[in-house]
């Protein structure tokens, strides 16, 4: 089955899910039973009715990102063929693969550095270096393609940047940086694994050279799955990459909704110009702050073909902590005076749809207990939003799990399992919102990343 056929089947399934959900939820009115005949003003009272309508309209905050996901998943081939090199890897500019770590998992770092180096060599890439930037020495073996940078404890940036921002800024200092302005940096987390497909995509991106920033797809169900619940929940993020992220970069070439912190490709001159020295507020979600600053300075972005591999958090607590940090960090970005309002408008709408999630999800209960009549368009849009969000989990599994590897029965079980994780994920996201709003904002929680640590405990 070729990629075009797969994409058409995916689009058919998506439309089927939308139409089915619209009909059964009342988004599309097919008979008189689809209409709500209650007069809420007399039935529930004025205050209760106003609150019910406010809760219903809060759902619409997610509409911009839902539309981006829908368009990205439909208008671009969701199952592209293997990436084909558009030029010789020998002609590619110098590439530095930069891994930032605290140094808590040295064995993991050593293993992944070796794997990633071999992946680059297998792809034919010759002009590259792997840099590991760490707070604590991991004692990497000496190799001409590997450089270990230990950030001194006494190092401070001009604005007092912390955590990952501080480490990344240290690498850009004149007495540390060994790269030319025309070189490129591929930013990875310590658990991120390159694939030959992603290396070819990066080579094509840097050979093209039209955009100084780029990012691609990360999947989470590769090799051994540690926690099935968090992995299935993260299938949503896979769809988010293939939908919203891909559309904003391929069509607009702007990080309208920000980007991720790994699989980040930057040109050195642009990265140094934007800088990671963005104070405390820019240190919790440093990737988001960096993208918004680059956006406000007029830099352009593009989507990079080819996927990389990561693992989902190993425990539900880590999953919760991860989401809490993202929420807190993005809120700091949205509220920062350093980012012009027009550049963070869509990001602000997106994060406030997340902040109000405990209120908007209460519609599930209140809509059943206290139905209210709404304009047909509102009912249609609300059902459309719900259908797309459900399908995001389904598509994420289809994209992440191999039918040949798992077999039809286990593959369908994974799809069903992803749908079943939605209530759990909603609960976790709601807890993360509440905890994020009342908890300490300037904290950087690092999740467990080394499987071998779990195996020996």
Curated annotation (Swiss-Prot):
Family per UniProt?
Answer: Belongs to the glycosyltransferase 2 family.
Q: Which InterPro entries match?
A: B_mannosylTrfase_Bre-3/Egh (IPR027389), Glyco_trans_2-like (IPR001173), Nucleotide-diphossugar_trans (IPR029044)
Membrane topology of the entry: Multi-pass membrane protein
Listed SUPFAM superfamilies? Nucleotide-diphospho-sugar transferases (SSF53448)
User: What is the name attached to this protein's record?
Assistant: Beta-1,4-mannosyltransferase egh
Q: What class of enzyme is it?
A: transferase
What keywords would UniProt list here? Answer: Developmental protein, Glycosyltransferase, Membrane, Transferase, Transmembrane, Transmembrane helix
Give the lineage: Eukaryota, Metazoa, Ecdysozoa, Arthropoda, Hexapoda
Summary of the function given for this chain in its UniProt record? Glycosyltransferase with a proposed role in glycosphingolipid biosynthesis. Neurogenic protein implicated in epithelial development. Critical component of a differential oocyte-follicle cell adhesive system.
> What EC designation does it have?
2.4.1.-
- GO CC aspect terms: cytoplasm; membrane
Q: Which GO terms describe its biological process?
A: axon guidance; border follicle cell migration; cell fate commitment; follicle cell of egg chamber development; follicle cell of egg chamber-cell adhesion; germ cell development; germarium-derived egg chamber formation; glycosphingolipid biosynthetic process
Q: Where are the transmembrane segments?
A: 8-28, 35-55, 57-77, 346-366, 378-398, 415-435
The record, for Pfam families, names:
Glyco_trans_2_3 (PF13632)
Q: Which GO terms describe its molecular function?
A: beta-1,4-mannosyltransferase activity
List the subcellular locations.
Membrane
